[in-house]
């Protein structure tokens, strides 16, 4: 019988995509997925190091696995992803029951690593950087049959003051244009209805000779899979070009949603964060986007309480939120990440209580803006890609609009994968509800 494995995944979409790659590598190597950790011969944690709370959540699962390993002789526990690359061999001191740690560039070696551990080899760390690794040639085992992820680049060269990604993921490297086009076309042929192109800084993608930028890739992908919805994330404001935005506005299967992290509305804070743009430059990009892509939804990331942030800086963040009118936002208060420029050079001098209070103001404002925006959708007919059965009721489906707005609607005869016109009848700050109108569009 094949040894079995179960993977806990934390963090971003790239980690989710990496879990699908790891699953494919293990299955090809003779391992089999388990239904849950309780029946698995090996439990892996694919970890995130971007924020302290993500590391803490992985630590809580590890504490649970420590007891499980005492009770189950032969259980193998491994750590994958950004935390091993970030904390390195120190993890063995913190979690002595962990059998191995593997960084994001070393997954091809995973089967051999596991077999060595099962044969009694001592704990080891596999955390070398490989600036060529994009996992080309590996066909991921995908968890979703409607919408999926496709990494088109890895790493980041920006070195924002607060961010560990350049430490955990290394420098930027792009998947070749022809390979991306072939993979997207294969996904369309396999019946997928939507793909999200992924990168830590996806719009800095370029071909090997730098003759083609992300706008060219996005246009090529759009033509290669005309029946699929195409999304991308995450973007850096300084790399959002007019040519890229024009492609989004012109191509009908490119989703009208751009995630554009700003982090702060204060130019002083943006300079300290090493973001490479000012408040005014960001707002100019927003104006250009809204002009070229009417009805576009813009979402963002926001950090409250970064080093030396004053009440004036915080108020500038609130006013920028109002000026942009974000659909939604990922909102956090600042936590120091050792190894970053900010950790080495700036004081973490905003009291935690102040950070939390400012974060709550940001959340309250965004919730109110989202509710107002979603309320304006009531009465409209929107096209929804049905993704799955609603978690609340088997009689409902859940899906998303081109603008990435979540919609719950009556199931009727529709199935996941259908494109369904839905009349919106109700809204909260996070979800639209509605009634399906006609036959699905499903070529």
Curated annotation (Swiss-Prot):
Subunit structure: Monomer.
Keywords in alphabetical order: 4Fe-4S, Cytoplasm, Iron, Iron-sulfur, Metal-binding, S-adenosyl-L-methionine, Transferase, tRNA processing
The keyword Metal-binding is assigned to this record: yes
Leader sequence segment: none
Major enzyme class: transferase
Species whose genome carries this gene: Chlorobaculum parvum (strain DSM 263 / NCIMB 8327)
Localization per record: Cytoplasm
Gene (UniProt): miaB
Cofactors (names): [4Fe-4S] cluster
Alphabetical list of HAMAP family matching this protein: tRNA_metthiotr_MiaB (MF_01864)
Single Gene Ontology MF annotation: N6-isopentenyladenosine methylthiotransferase activity
Radical SAM core domain boundaries: 142-372
NCBIfam families (alphabetical): miaB-methiolase, MiaB/RimO family radical SAM methylthiotransferase
Family: Belongs to the methylthiotransferase family. MiaB subfamily.
Annotated Pfam families: Radical_SAM, TRAM, UPF0004
MTTase N-terminal domain span: 3-119
Matches recorded under InterPro entries: Elp3/MiaA/NifB-like_rSAM, Methylthiotransferase, Methylthiotransferase_CS, Methylthiotransferase_N, Methylthiotransferase_N_sf, MiaB_methiolase, rSAM, rSAM_horseshoe
Coiled-coil annotated spans: none
Enzyme Commission numbers on file: 2.8.4.3
Sites where the protein binds [4Fe-4S] cluster 1: 12, 48, 82
Reactions performed catalytically: N(6)-dimethylallyladenosine(37) in tRNA + (sulfur carrier)-SH + AH2 + 2 S-adenosyl-L-methionine = 2-methylsulfanyl-N(6)-dimethylallyladenosine(37) in tRNA + (sulfur carrier)-H + 5'-deoxyadenosine + L-methionine + A + S-adenosyl-L-homocysteine + 2 H(+)
Binding of [4Fe-4S] cluster 2, residues: 156, 160, 163
A GO-annotated cellular component: cytosol
Segments forming domain TRAM: 375-438
Protein's name in the database: tRNA-2-methylthio-N(6)-dimethylallyladenosine synthase
């Amino acid at each position: 019988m094949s040894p079995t494995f179960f993977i806990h995944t934390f963090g971003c979409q790239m980690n989710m995509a990496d879990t699908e790659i790891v699953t494919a590598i293990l299955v090809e190597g003779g391992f089999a997925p388990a239904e849950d950790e309780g029946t698995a011969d090996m439990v892996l944690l694919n970890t995130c190091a971007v924020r302290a709370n993500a590391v803490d959540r992985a630590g809580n699962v590890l504490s649970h696995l420590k007891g499980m390993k005492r009770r189950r002789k032969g259980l193998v526990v491994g750590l994958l992803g950004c935390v091993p690359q970030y904390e390195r061999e120190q993890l063995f001191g913190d979690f002595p029951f962990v059998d191995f740690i593997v960084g994001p560039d070393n997954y091809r070696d995973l089967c051999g690593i596991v077999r060595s551990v099962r044969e009694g080899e001592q704990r080891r760390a596999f955390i070398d950087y490989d600036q060529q690794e994009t996992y080309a040639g590996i066909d991921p085992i995908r968890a979703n049959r409607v919408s999926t992820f496709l990494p088109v680049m890895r790493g980041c060269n920006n070195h924002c003051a607060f961010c560990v990604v350049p430490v955990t993921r290394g420098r930027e490297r792009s998947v070749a244009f022809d390979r991306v086009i072939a993979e997207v076309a294969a996904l369309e042929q396999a019946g997928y209805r939507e793909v999200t192109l992924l990168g830590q800084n996806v719009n800095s993608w370029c071909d090997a000779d730098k003759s083609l930028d992300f706008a060219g890739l996005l246009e090529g992908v759009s033509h290669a899979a005309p029946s699929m919805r195409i999304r991308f994330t995450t973007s850096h404001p300084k790399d959002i070009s007019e040519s890229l935005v024009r492609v989004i506005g012109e191509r009908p299967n490119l989703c009208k949603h751009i995630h554009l992290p700003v982090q702060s509305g204060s130019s002083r804070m943006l300079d300290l964060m090493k973001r490479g743009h000012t408040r005014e430059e960001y707002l100019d990009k927003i104006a250009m986007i809204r002009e070229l892509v009417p009805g576009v939804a813009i979402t963002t990331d926001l950090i409250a309480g970064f080093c030396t942030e004053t009440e004036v800086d915080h108020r500038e963040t609130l006013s920028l939120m109002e000026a942009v009118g974000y659909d939604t936002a990922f909102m956090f208060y600042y936590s120091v990440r050792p190894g970053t420029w900010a950790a080495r050079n700036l004081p973490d001098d905003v009291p935690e209580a102040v950070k939390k209070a400012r974060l709550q103001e940001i959340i309250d404002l965004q919730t109110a803006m989202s509710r107002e925006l979603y309320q304006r959708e009531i009465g409209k007919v929107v096209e929804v890609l049905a993704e799955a059965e609603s978690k609340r009721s088997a009689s409902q489906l859940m899906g998303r609009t081109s603008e990435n707005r979540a919609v719950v609607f009556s199931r009727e005869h529709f199935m996941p994968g259908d494109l369904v016109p839905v009349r919106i009848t109700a809204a909260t700050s996070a979800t639209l509800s509605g009634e399906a109108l006609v036959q699905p569009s499903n070529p």
